[in-house]
Design a protein with these regions (language model features):
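Active-site neighborhoods and metal-handling regions in enzymes and metal-associated proteins
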Residues: 1-192
């Protein structure tokens, strides 16, 4: 529902209704190290056509982000690239205008209306661990890739977050066994 558009919602006092989405952001600690995961699920077991459209756009951003995240970029550069990918998806969703994006103030990108947080953060001893934002990403870094699309006017808030380990052989998604596609989530929700 509408509270999925609040990045870190704390009250949790509303009764969910059919048609609502539940955005879950949770993690665990093991041996003093943190993990962080977000998934969005439909209360009724099936996404509406619009929810599915927005969810799949967010998933495409995440998949592109996992591929893009590498040692040639700093976190600042990575976020800028994710911003461009997000703009394209928001244009396709009818939320942004291509001409307005072309003429936007680069210091106030229009996509931030619908994706107001960073594309991810360092993980380690703390769930939001410290790391150099302006230096190149290093092998061994552990990072979240967590795009979100939040549309308060439509009561749609979607975030998909996985933990990525950067290795010389490529990025390893530590959450690869956790369902993430619309089909996987609907199968679980409907008991298939």
């Amino acid at each position: 529902g509408k509270n999925a558009c609040i990045l870190h919602y704390g009250e949790n006092n509303n009764i969910v209704q059919a048609g609502d989405l539940i955005l879950m952001d949770f993690g665990v600690e093991y041996a003093n190290y943190a993990a962080d995961l977000s998934r969005t699920i439909p209360v009724s077991g099936k996404f509406s056509p619009r929810q599915k459209e927005v969810y799949n756009a967010c998933l495409r951003i995440q998949k592109a982000g996992i591929e893009l995240f590498n040692t040639s970029l700093s976190l600042i550069e990575y976020n800028a690239e994710i911003g461009k990918i997000t703009e394209s998806e928001l244009i396709q969703l009818g939320l942004l205008d291509k001409i307005a994006v072309k003429n936007q103030n680069p210091n106030a990108p229009l996509y931030k209306k619908y994706f107001m947080h960073g594309a991810g953060h360092f993980l380690g001893i703390d769930v939001h661990d410290v790391g150099p934002r302006y230096e190149k990403i290093q092998y061994g870094n552990l990072f979240t890739i967590e795009p979100g699309i939040y549309i308060p006017a439509e009561n749609i808030g979607i975030r998909i977050e996985d933990n990525i380990h950067v290795t010389p052989e490529g990025n390893v998604n530590l959450m690869h066994d956790i369902p993430v596609t619309v089909e996987e989530i609907e199968d679980i929700m409907l008991g298939s």
